[in-house]
Amino acid sequence: MKKRLTLLGLLILVVAIPLVIFLTLTYQNVKQKAQALGNVTSRSVIGQIPEEVTAGSLISRNAPAFASSGYYPASNANDDSYDTTWRSQGTPGWLAYDLSNVPTSQRSKVLVVWYNETSNYDHTIIGYNAYNMPQDYTIDINPGDGGGSPPGGGWITVATVKGNHYHSREHVIDMAGNNWIRINVTRVDGSLENYDASINMDVYDATYGIADNWIFFGDSITAGGMGHATTGGVKAFAQLINARAPKYFPAQESGGIGYLTSADGVKYINMWLKLFPGKYVALSYGTNDANGCVDADNFYNNYVSLVQAVLNAGKIPVIPHIPWARTANVQHCGPMLNARIDTLYKAFPQIIKGPDLWAFFQGNQNLISNDNLHPTDTGFGAYRQQWANAMLTTVYKTKV
């Protein structure tokens, strides 16, 4: 009898242990997928893009576009090129998309992103002028039937912005039950003869969150390299990703501002992060630090503060090496600061390593302009390509 019970017990253990392991692994897998879908900015989310995010998430490309007026047509705002924009004839002026042909399952919640050609992310910090940049505006939706002209009434305002001083903004909008979406600009920030609204505008399916979304903070090199217009024959970062990994088409903002150092980044980072609902935050400060030969310990501590701010916001920091340049200070101090970035990688394993811009430009010195600091136009295009290549390999798991 005892022998029979012993055999029965062993049989139960043989069956039960694998079952427990299977159930545990299944639960963990489901939990991870739920986190990726339901909380894409969770600190527990790994660096790779969730499989659920696809290029189909960009739902506004070539959708019927309409505008109140325009020096340039509404269709310029959502065509295949970021080199073209819609430009109003004065303000108020609106730009509307008919999304009625998009499956309703892909537009119950959307991400609206608009981009303006003003070079600096926040031009007020360094006193530069804006260029036809929306300052006061609303995002509106409408349940009216699609397939024709925009509705004359019944617009529902779902986001209101006043006093904007950024050249791009993002808004997560609940659009369930609606077919139309528009931006209505009532005031513009610009200079003489540049007081029209001029933008590109993308709309993404945000049903599964907004994991495939990037912002690149940095200095004038970031500003020159990570905008949307073609630079040095190279298209925008998002288009480069899509060209090599057609499943994806990331939302992307350039957060570059001329003259800024890592200390300036620390000053503004928390304010900026509140505006950015996405996942990946590139931190590309250091050229101005190196050119001023700042104390390496201070530089490192600034970056620690930046990384902690990004992690505390539930996002993922992405950090490259400082680019090589010809100035004596950068050549002398740059390696010391890049060594601190290497230390940062070890201290914070959550960091995704960006491109080694020092090695690249040191090996391609002809891509540095006559000011000995900034890339040439072709160099800016190469800078952008280096970013895309690095992220294709690291994040999108695509060979380049």
Regions found by a protein language model. Give the residues of each.
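Disordered, acidic Ser/Thr/Pro-rich linker "stalks" and the adjacent N-terminal cap
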Residues: Q32-S105, N116-N132, I221
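N-terminal Sec-pathway targeting helices
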Residues: M1-L13
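Serine-esterase "nucleophile elbow" of acetyl-processing enzymes
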Residues: I49, R187-G255, N270-P277
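Extended extracellular/luminal ectodomain segments enriched in beta-structured repeat modules
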Residues: P92, N101-L111, N178-N179, G209
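Oxyanion-hole/transition-state-stabilizing segment in secreted/luminal serine hydrolases
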Residues: A263-Y300, A309, V318-R326
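Trp- and acidic/polar-enriched beta-sheet ligand-binding modules for extracellular glycan
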Residues: Q89-G93, E117-D205
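Sec-dependent signal peptide cleavage junction
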Residues: L19-N39
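Catalytic His-Asp segment of secreted/periplasmic serine-dependent ester chemistry enzymes
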Residues: A325-V400
